[in-house]
Regions:
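Short catalytic micro-motifs in class I SAM-dependent methyltransferases
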Residues: 146-147
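A conserved beta-strand element that flanks and buttresses the S-adenosyl-L-methionine
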Residues: 143
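A short glycine-rich, Lys/Arg-flanked "PGG" loop and its adjoining helix->strand segment in the class I
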Residues: 157-169
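Conserved class I S-adenosyl-L-methionine
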Residues: 3-71, 73-80
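Class I SAM-dependent methyltransferase SAM/SAH-binding core
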Residues: 83-131
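Core SAM-dependent methyltransferase catalytic element
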Residues: 232-234, 238-256
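C-terminal alpha-helical "lid/dimerization" subdomain adjacent to the S-adenosyl-L-methionine
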Residues: 176-232, 239
Length: 256
């Protein structure tokens, strides 16, 4: 990293520290992300390039919009929007998108994409499951993809309960993340196999980024995730488990 970029990163870290002074001393600091550090400008720039090797962002976005049954009169929160993969596509089809992320570096890239696409119906917000304050009217839907695993389990539940309050009654949540549904007795062989497969699929020189996910981040088991969603105030309409490592949930906020 160049000297100028290092200076900028130090300033951003200091700024984030000041922001979190207003929070209780016991609250989990979601701004200081665990695992791979996406607060880094360098990491943010590399994110799209890496994920495009195994994800079709446009197809994913279209499928999510269809699953949620969204239309041009509706609003959505993209919690953990990253560089705007879903946000930018969704904004072309919806009334408004609230794009939320803990990484200012990611948000900067997302804003650039929005300007390039000439989209003016996106509100970018710095925050996450625990810190984002939604001051507008409740939204029709919330989308969260590859994000919730950054929170420890207790804070996952707190974050999901906060999302419920941002949704209209009968509003919907689409949640996609790393969730373990394999037989725990075979965890070593399953994890080793997954890491080897993804290393080859992504053309990585080293599996360390994947190792970090299992070693430092907070992916959980399917039965735990289902319990969190239900206790938070959601009805699970559909749960889809893929390859024993990925899960998608379509949920509805319970009526009053």
């Amino acid at each position: 990293m160049k000297v100028r970029e290092m200076d900028i990163e130090l300033y951003r870290n200091y700024s984030n520290m000041l922001e979190n002074r207003s929070k209780p001393g016991w609250q989990y600091n979601e701004i200081k992300s665990c695992g791979v550090k996406f607060n880094s400008a360098m990491r943010a720039r590399a994110y799209d390039k890496c994920h495009q090797r195994f994800r079709d962002f446009k197809k994913e976005s279209e499928e999510i919009i269809a699953i949620l049954g969204l239309n041009t009169d509706q609003t959505v929160i993209d919690i953990g929007c990253g560089t705007g993969a879903f946000t930018i596509h969704a904004a072309k089809h919806l009334k408004k998108v609230y794009a939320v992320d803990v990484s200012k570096a990611m948000l900067r890239l997302a804003r650039r994409k929005a300007r390039k696409a000439k989209l003016d119906n996106i509100e970018f917000c710095h925050g996450g499951f625990l810190t984002y304050e939604h001051r507008a009217e409740p939204v029709d839907a919330i989308v969260s993809s590859h994000v919730l695993h950054h929170l420890p389990d207790f804070w996952k539940l707190i974050g999901l309960k906060r999302l419920v309050q941002m949704l209209k009654t009968n509003g919907r949540l689409y949640l996609h993340d790393v969730v373990f549904s394999f037989d725990i007795a075979s965890y070593e062989s399953r994890i080793n196999g997954f890491i080897q497969s993804m290393t080859e699929k992504l053309g990585l020189q080293s599996p360390e980024g994947l190792n970090i996910h299992f070693r430092q981040e907070h992916s959980t088991c399917n039965w735990i995730m289902q319990g969190f969603l239900e206790r938070a105030g959601f009805v699970i309409d559909k749960a889809d488990y893929k390859d024993d490592f990925m899960a998608s949930y379509l949920c509805t906020r319970k009526g009053e």
